[in-house]
Amino acid sequence: MKKIGVLAFQGGVIEHVKKIEELGHIPVLVKKNEDLEGIDGLILPGGESTTIGKFLIETGLKDKILSLAEQGMPMWGTCAGAILLSKSIKNQGSGVLPLLDIVIERNAYGSQIDSFRKEVFVPRFNKTTECVFIRAPKIVDVGSNVEVLAQLDTPIAVLQGTILATTFHPELTSQNYWHSFFVENMIK
């Protein structure tokens, strides 16, 4: 069994926890540095990226997470988590954890009322997955070392080494493809 940390300040925390449990692994709620001890991977859920980033800095988690990333710990950001992991946020600088060579634009699909679900084919899975977009960011550029796993008009899921980002919320669907990919394929 693998221990998967879920950053637990806000957002789809409980939904990610349930997906991890469905796969037979152990979720660990991460709110302080000590919670990172012994985990095998870390999920940064959606929510409000500015607020989550502020908590990461205030709690000292930012530096510890960056250190773990340098050591090769797999990490996955969904929606706001993808913003946190971005090296560049369009017209705003960089994410708090700038580990992923992408340029991202906040709320690019519109406001809460513009939220939508879409079926998207993912070649890596050879399956169509349901994607839920809620005030979702848009990846507007990717670096040469970034693999695009899924896209609509622009990339919606990317992978760079041990860092995964999705601009949508896989935790809000009945499917478990993305969580399985993260836990079973990315975490050794």
Curated annotation (Swiss-Prot):
Statement: the UniProt record of this protein carries the keyword Lyase: yes
List of catalytic residues: 79 (nucleophile), 169 (charge relay system), 171 (charge relay system)
Gene Ontology process terms (BP): glutamine catabolic process; pyridoxal phosphate biosynthetic process; pyridoxine metabolic process
Q: Which GO terms describe its molecular function?
A: glutaminase activity; pyridoxal 5'-phosphate synthase (glutamine hydrolysing) activity
Keywords from the UniProt entry:
Glutamine amidotransferase, Hydrolase, Lyase, Pyridoxal phosphate
Q: Which reaction does it catalyse?
A: aldehydo-D-ribose 5-phosphate + D-glyceraldehyde 3-phosphate + L-glutamine = pyridoxal 5'-phosphate + L-glutamate + phosphate + 3 H2O + H(+); L-glutamine + H2O = L-glutamate + NH4(+)
State if Protein biosynthesis is listed as a keyword: no
Any single Pfam family the record assigns to this protein = SNO
Identify the CDD domains for this entry.
GATase1_PB (cd01749)
List positions binding L-glutamine: 47-49, 106, 134-135
Query: What Gene3D superfamilies does this protein map onto?
Result: 3.40.50.880
GO cellular component entries: cytosol; glutaminase complex
- EC number(s): the record gives 4.3.3.6, 3.5.1.2
Q: Which family does it belong to?
A: Belongs to the glutaminase PdxT/SNO family.
| The protein's role, per its UniProt record | Catalyzes the hydrolysis of glutamine to glutamate and ammonia as part of the biosynthesis of pyridoxal 5'-phosphate. The resulting ammonia molecule is channeled to the active site of PdxS.
Against NCBIfam families, the record matches this protein to: PLP_synth_Pdx2
PANTHER family noted in UniProt: PYRIDOXAL 5'-PHOSPHATE SYNTHASE SUBUNIT SNO, PYRIDOXAL 5'-PHOSPHATE SYNTHASE SUBUNIT SNO1-RELATED
Q: What name does UniProt use for this protein?
A: Pyridoxal 5'-phosphate synthase subunit PdxT
Q: Which organism is it from?
A: Caldicellulosiruptor saccharolyticus (strain ATCC 43494 / DSM 8903 / Tp8T 6331)
